[in-house]
Amino acid sequence: MSKIWKFTSFATISSVAAASLYLYAIDKNGYYYEKSKFKQVTDRVRKLIDGDETFKYVTIDDFVSGPTQIQTRSRGETFKDLWNAEVRRTAQWIYSLGGR
């Protein structure tokens, strides 16, 4: 019985994986694969490494028009805020386990 169960589970997982691959990459000439964000990022990185595409450096002027005041924070303050937000989320989750 154990061998039949192992074979059945292996066959099921293999067929689901094969069907997913077929529907994602082969069916409709790979439409979903070609349009995926993962493929676009991979192609862009490959072009950058090969030197076919140049990396455009952006400055703050590309994002803001006119004079603006930009506030900068230290890395310590940023990490402290992230830590506090995570502690609050954890405490909220723990209290939510208590019910109503």
Curated annotation (Swiss-Prot):
Keyword Transmembrane: yes
Record field: transmembrane: 10-26
Places the protein is found: Mitochondrion inner membrane
A GO cellular component annotation in the UniProt record: mitochondrial crista junction
Any Pfam family hit: AIM5
Subcellular location, principal: mitochondrion
Gene Ontology annotations of biological process type: cristae formation
Keyword terms of this UniProt record: Membrane, Mitochondrion, Mitochondrion inner membrane, Transmembrane, Transmembrane helix
Coiled-coil blocks: none
Topology in the lipid bilayer: Single-pass membrane protein
Protein task: Component of the MICOS complex, a large protein complex of the mitochondrial inner membrane that plays crucial roles in the maintenance of crista junctions, inner membrane architecture, and formation of contact sites to the outer membrane.
Family of this protein: Belongs to the MICOS complex subunit Mic12 family.
Quaternary context: Component of the mitochondrial contact site and cristae organizing system (MICOS) complex.
Identification of the protein by name: MICOS complex subunit MIC12
Gene label: AIM5
